Amino acid sequence: HETGLAWNAPLVGGDLATHAITDGPTVITVSILARPALPASRVVTRDGGRPGDLLAVTGRLGGSLEADGRGRHLDFIPRIHEAILLAETLGNDLRAMMDLSDGLAQDAGRLAAAGHGTARIDAASLPTSEGCDWRAAVTDGEDYELLFACRTPPPATLLGTPVTVVGRLEAPSASFPEGAVVVGEGGDARRIDHLGWEHRSGG
């Protein structure tokens, strides 16, 4: 509730309920009313990326969940203002955008597939959190940073948050089909879109 108020999104209630049915599927319904901060023609979805676009992220990746269950995933600040500023700064050069909740390996694949392409990530470019290698950066999840595709280089910072180009979108191939995420480390390239957080499997 407090987080919602901080972003002018109060939890109104009225449709919050539980039921005692135990032998059927769990059903969760979330109703959201919102007014876009940008004109309707500039709503940025995840399906606008095209081969040749740069892939970039805000902040640092990996290490969001600590061994005791605590960590950055419990007190992150949504990148709402950064997303709006990014759209205003890049204009039509901002092609697609989403948040990173299941890890870059999973989410880059979703963004690439939505635009009928593949994603190639440069391991050496990843902005990793302290104590994390590139593998943790692409698989840990719960980063809640922005992942976006753009035609031109993005600004180096947004409201004090670093922005890093980590790769680019490419056309699918026989080796790397639509939705594949490929990470390059030195001269090596491997698919990683099978990694990351899978809901209902616990990992």
Describe these PLM feature segments.
Residues 18-19, 158-203:
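Acidic, Ser/Thr/Pro-rich beta/coil linker or hinge segments at domain junctions
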Residues 33-35, 147-151:
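Short hydrophobic/aromatic beta-strand micro-patches
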Residues 30-47, 71-89:
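Active-site glycine-rich loop that binds ribose-phosphate moieties when present
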Residues 15-17, 60-61, 100-103, 124-126, ...:
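Short, ordered loop/turn segments at secondary-structure junctions
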Residues 1-65, 168:
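Glycine-rich anion-binding loops of enzyme active sites
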Residues 4, 90, 112, 158-159:
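A generic structural signal for well-ordered alpha-helical segments
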